[in-house]
Structures are given as structure tokens and as C-alpha cells.
């Protein structure tokens, strides 16, 4: 029997919808329809009471009847400790996402008449390490070898960039999907697509626009009938479906009618119907601030790339929400030019992923294609050092894959272990950033503080997943970890980090200066104390006693966090300790030292 043919695919695992595509032997890319005949599969999973698992359109269709056992927008929970509980079983976000990937895989295998083992899967550029790791795990659970995790805007630009070979351009990808917003600036030319800046909001998308319409309709109905439809799960589900449908219709029409018969029952037992007309201007007034929220990340990305809006050659729209006329108007007003609408906003990401998959797998259709994707890390990575400061090792917007090292040392005499605490963020104080995980390097030979040399290395692979290692250069002892931190921060924390860094810049600067002063004071106290122990017999007793008192007072001020006193005593101790050298020289030469 002939072996089944193997295919390599690209998958856009989206918050609202997912898409799968492959590159044909002739080099063109085909979006693969699902079993229902649609090129887009809703990212919805349902568990029926009989134990059947429904995915995609069948799951979405029964949401009204089975809201408690239906899961949508699970992508927002990727990389967190969130669990979905159905009956007595708990599911991680990775497992729910794997059901979606498995459906895409199975339907595509049936369509292509072969096997799919390898895939490139996309994620938002702003996904942190834990979220990328979770995306990769979802692929593995679904039975896929994940060739690479690539950023959605990068994939979209790849789909677009093929037609632009030989022309150097700066392209801004504006990606407003169901649950996330990303903006990336790319340089495209000579077969290289390079991300030069990325920013975004991990908690802004079509779901939020739907919610505004749901709330408006619910409030209007409540005014008329005194019943809040949001308190009834099935009524809320019908409202949600109607809101999504109205939003889509208002992209091409100036108004739409919503009709939901028998949505509730009055206290007297009368059936109640919801009949409303929603105009485009009403929809725009309800959601204008959401569109405005995309301005900050655009400005951030332009600022990071050191570009003005006029420097951008093309603006590509990605994500179904970019069909909304108000979004397109906003972009035109911001950049002073029309966005490029030649890329299908729902399919571009999957097409780009399929191209990258074909290139990585070396398939027939990709022969002669030499495209290099250069991604960047979205937030600075580093470790906590003495005094709780954050020491950056890989700055934000560094091209990946990347490997960087720095040498650190011990802060106590005889210290035999160090804890490496890894953080991601833009604040100079470690605890203000996202904690990604920690590990201990043990077995350091005892030595005075400052003597051991510990090399800390950060290695980010092509999927954006972080590997951290620490090596004691003296003993050769080494310890490492792959960052899989499932931090419990809310999802919009990442988006806020860069804004926080700006807002707290002055406060952080002052705090950093205070910590650095205390560190310098502590180092000086240690150094003077060590000199007194080693050469005490050569120093007059009154100077030695005075210095010991000053060291004691300085350490007390450090412990009490009395910064003005630390500064004063640090300066005094510096001046007074200069006299030690004078006596050591006198002792060494056996002569008198003249006073200046």
C-alpha cells in the first residue's frame, strides 16, 4: 500500500477564528476549507452533555443552548494558570487550543488526502514567554511537530512581502483581531523581512467592541421592560451573537436591525421580544475610545523605530476588525495615507505561516525562496541584582534568535550559592516587572565577596522561548532553566508595562539612585573593614576606632533606609578612609609623610 503523502502547513491560531493553509508545489498558497466548507474556523470548543466534543462552527451554533459548556476566546488565557472545568475534569488553555488545532489538522488531512505532521503556528507579537511556550505545547498536544512559532504581523508581512521583492520598504502592520491588538514595523527588502519594532495591547479586540453593543442593547431593553438580559446566560448568548452580526453588517451598511423574539418573559408571563435598529454612527459613538486605544501602541512602535508616520511606506491591515470603516478612517488620518487593503485580513497570517513552513521544510513550492524572518523580543529580559535592581541582559526590540551573557559576582563573604531571578519588563526595579522564574546555582567555592565570577547567559531561540543559564567560571558548575513561568498577572499587565515605565520614570530613577548609593556605601564599608582587619597594626588606634564607629553608623543608616544620613556618612567615610593609605605608605617606607 502506498505511503500517505505528508504535508506541511501554516496555522493562524486566533482568538475568534483560526485558519490553516499550505503551499502547493507551484508555489501558490491555498487556504484549506474545513469540513463545513468554510475557510475560517471559529476558535470555539464545546462539551455536550453526552460527552461529545464539538469544535468550530458546530460548537458555535450550539452556544445558546449550552453556554456553560462552551469555551471561546481561550487564547486570552494562554500562558496562565487558568483551568476550564467541565464535569469532573479540568482542561488547561493548551488542551482547549489543541482541540482547535486537531480539528484544523484533521479537516485539512481529509481535504488534502494525506498526513500533516509539521506546522508553523502564529501568535501575537506581544505574547510573552509563557504564552509562546503554551502555544507550542498546544501544537504538540494536537500531534504536531511545531517547526516554529512566528509573530502574526511578521507572517502577514511575509504573505505581502513576496510581491515586493527587490523594493525596500518600511511597512506597518496594524493587526486588530478578536482579542488582541498588535502593531509591528518591518523593513522589507532583498529577501529579508525584519521586525524593527513591535508594540500592542494584549486585551483589546473585537470582543470588546461586541461587549459595547451588548451593553447598549441590554440597557435599552432594561429601560423598556425592567429586565437585565445579561443575568440570563441564554439571553446573553443571543445578545452576543446579535452584536457580532450587527458589527459585521455595519462595516458595509449604514444601519442594521436586530430582532430577537421571545428573549425574555415578563413578571406576568408575557413573552418579550427585542427589536432594535442600530446605526453605524451609534456603533461608532459606542466604540470610538476603543479605536483611540490603538494610538498609544502605534506611537510607541514608531518611537522605538525612530520613525515618523510619514516614514511608513505601506500600512497593512490584519484581523477582521480592520474592516470597520472607523478603524480605516483612524489609520488614514494618523498616517495621512490610505491603508493597503490588498491582503485578506482574515487569511494573511495563515498564508504567511504556510510560506514560512514550506521554506523551513524545504518543500517543492518553496524552492528558490530565500526569505529571512527577523523577529524581536517584545520586552527587556534580565535578572535581579543587589538591592533589588533589575539588570537588563537582552534589551527590548533585540533581534532573535539571540544569545547574550554578563558576568556577576557574590555579595557576601563565603557565599556558596546564588539565586538567579529572571524578570521581563522595562522598570529599573526588579519587582515592578514580570517575574518569569528562578533557579539556584550551588557549589560555588567559598571566597570573599566580589571574587567569584558567575556568567549568566540568556538564549532566546527562534520561537522566542527563553533559556537561562548560570556558570561559576571558577569551578565550572552550571545550572540552567527554560522559562515556563505561569505568572498570575492579569493579561493587560504586559501592555501596561511600557506605559508604567514612562509614568514612573522619575520615581524609579530616584529609587534606583538610592539603591545604588546604598550598594556603594555597603561596598565601601566592607572594603574599609577588610583593610582595618588586614592592616590594623599599622593604623593609629584613634583613627581605627573612628572608622569602626563610622562603619557601624553607616550600616545602621543603610538598614533604616535613611538616605540623607547614608549620603553624609558615605562621604565622611570616603574622606576619613583616605588617611589609611597615608599610614600604610608611612609604614611601608618607614619615613614621615608630610601633610599637605
Curated annotation (Swiss-Prot):
The modification Phosphothreonine is found at residue 180. One of its GO terms (molecular function) is ATP hydrolysis activity. One of its GO terms (biological process) is chaperone cofactor-dependent protein refolding. Gene3D superfamilies: 1.20.1270.10, 3.30.30.30, 3.30.420.40, Actin, Chain A, domain 4 (3.90.640.10), Substrate Binding Domain Of DNAk, Chain A, domain 1 (2.60.34.10). Induction: By stress conditions e.g. heat shock. Keywords: ATP-binding, Chaperone, Nucleotide-binding, Phosphoprotein, Stress response. InterPro entries: ATPase_NBD, Chaperone_DnaK, Heat_shock_70_CS, HSP70_C_sf, HSP70_peptide-bd_sf, Hsp_70_fam. Belongs to the heat shock protein 70 family. This is Chaperone protein DnaK. It comes from Thermotoga maritima (strain ATCC 43589 / DSM 3109 / JCM 10099 / NBRC 100826 / MSB8). The lineage of its organism: Bacteria, Thermotogati, Thermotogota, Thermotogae, Thermotogales.
